[in-house]
Amino acid sequence: MALNKEDILTWLEGAKTMEVVELVTAIEEKFGVTAAVATSVGGAASTGSTDSEEQTEFDVILMSFGDSKINVIKEVRSITGLGLGEAKALVESAPKAIKEGLSKSDAEELKKKLEAVGAKVEVK
């Protein structure tokens, strides 16, 4: 007689914990798999949330140049060392990363400088 999924689930409902552990072990050995994959997926999700709390590198993103495009271009030039044409193209293509991989304090400092000349900036 062939077993179907319902038969297996019914057996599992009535099985003792040790029987289920033995079944899992037998499945792991027979098929060369591990039940730890399901556990690590849940662990990775919780680790991901703590990683965002412990972020060490930040990107400064220019969201828009606001009303003072020329002043923002000048500030972007001084921050990045780009030429006039490159800085203008960068500012006009907002939202765009101005600097990446900065410490939190450096990113906040750049944000303040850009906001002081009228830009809308995010730190991510």
Swiss-Prot record:
GO biological process: translation
A single GO cellular-component term on record: cytosolic large ribosomal subunit
Keyword Ribosomal protein in record: yes
GO molecular function: mRNA binding; structural constituent of ribosome
Source taxon at top rank: Bacteria
Name of one Pfam family that matches: Ribosomal_L12_N
Keywords: Ribonucleoprotein, Ribosomal protein
UniProt key word Transcription: no
Subunit details: Homodimer. Part of the ribosomal stalk of the 50S ribosomal subunit. Forms a multimeric L10(L12)X complex, where L10 forms an elongated spine to which 2 to 4 L12 dimers bind in a sequential fashion. Binds GTP-bound translation factors.
Protein family (similarity comment): Belongs to the bacterial ribosomal protein bL12 family.
Described purpose of this protein according to its UniProt entry: Forms part of the ribosomal stalk which helps the ribosome interact with GTP-bound translation factors. Is thus essential for accurate translation.
Name under which the protein is recorded: Large ribosomal subunit protein bL12
Gene assigned in the entry: rplL
